[in-house]
Regions:
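Alpha/beta-hydrolase active-site loop
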Residues: 117-138
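Conserved alpha/beta-hydrolase
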Residues: 90-113
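Short alpha-helix in the alpha/beta-hydrolase fold that links the catalytic acid
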Residues: 89, 219, 228, 242-251
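An N-terminal hydrophobic leader/cap segment in hydrolases
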Residues: 1-49
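Hydrolase active-site cap/lid region
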Residues: 157-212
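Catalytic histidine-centered segment of alpha/beta-hydrolase-like enzymes
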Residues: 266-276
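The serine-hydrolase catalytic nucleophile loop
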Residues: 79-93
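Short beta-strand/loop motif that positions the catalytic acidic residue
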Residues: 225-227, 232-234, 238
Length: 293
């Protein structure tokens, strides 16, 4: 079960073509947009040494009007995906909201190294480092962390750490309350099995092999320590990361400004695709509100 959940295949560079196709299915023309900016030298690649000394990769692109950039967004992908998949968010931030954007590959995904999918728990350390890198590249004092699915769990988990003062906001879209809660749902949906003994054993293997347990990887526990303003998004038709995770996450954050928006009729990671104008409007209004706090 541990290998099944955390060491899936194909992954990494072997999975690039599928994710490029997925990016275009979510917003047509996304890979052509990406390839065009890259050919012009506007969109660039970079690598750093991430957590546990694995080399990790990201792309970055300046705002459409760099001289008047409104800030910098760190866009974080989900489980089994990579930096290509959520190009719709990169395009939203860069082209429509005039933000600089850095969008990484988490460990074991895309062009990044890694020995397993970390479910956000260790990924948060790399995202925090990427925020520092983006701040160095663009010089902004307003950075927003925006994640979807496992990426949303990653940014929620990061929000409970001590973040630099330029990280001003977090947007989480359909993140799970903990790795344990998520795998429990998956185990029931896919195999009609209870968490004991399989999930319990897999969590113990993860702790022994990688240093973290499924219950330890908790968005909820990190949110209890979070003070950074946060927008919570979830589709009410989501049964992959069940909709009730939204309220559980939202209620866990008791300090700092927060908002909630529900994507009506949206399945998992589909709120933007179903309501693109409304999604963008809520993100824009939230970020503008944060700037007044």
């Amino acid at each position: 079960m541990c290998n099944y959940a955390l060491k899936f295949n194909p992954h990494g560079e072997a999975d690039i073509e599928r994710t490029r196709e997925k990016a275009d299915s979510l917003l047509p023309g996304s890979t052509a947009w990406y390839d065009g900016l890259k050919a012009q030298g506007i969109l660039k690649d970079t690598t750093i040494v991430g957590y546990r000394d694995f080399k990790v990769h990201a792309c970055y692109v300046p705002a459409a009007n760099p001289a008047k950039a409104n800030g910098t967004a760190i866009v974080v992908h989900g489980y089994g995906d990579n930096h290509f998949v959520f190009l719709y968010l990169v395009r939203m931030y860069r082209d429509n909201l005039n933000y600089n954007v850095l969008f990484p590959d988490l460990q074991y995904h895309g062009y990044s190294e890694g020995d397993h999918a970390q479910m956000g728990w260790y990924d948060r350390f790399d995202v925090e480092k990427w925020a520092e890198v983006a701040h160095g590249i663009f010089g902004d004092d307003f950075v927003v962390l925006h994640g979807v699915s496992m990426g949303a769990a990653t940014v929620m988990m990061a929000s409970g750490d001590e973040l630099p003062p330029y990280v001003k906001a977090v947007v989480e879209d359909c993140g799970y309350s903990s790795a344990w809660d998520q795998f429990k749902v998956n185990l029931k949906q896919s195999f009609h099995l209870p968490p004991f003994p399989i999930l319990t054993s897999a969590s113990m293997v993860s702790k022994s092999r990688y240093g973290w347990s499924f219950k330890e990887a908790s968005s909820v526990e990190q949110l209890k320590k979070s003070t950074v303003p946060m927008l919570f998004i979830h589709g009410d038709a989501d049964d992959f990361v069940p909709f009730e995770h939204l309220q559980k996450n939202y209620d866990a954050k008791t300090t700092g400004y927060k908002e909630m928006w529900v994507g009506e009729g949206a399945v998992h990671a589909n709120s933007y695709a179903k309501h693109p104008e409304e999604y963008e409007a809520h993100v824009k209004a939230f970020l503008e509100k944060v700037k007044t706090l």
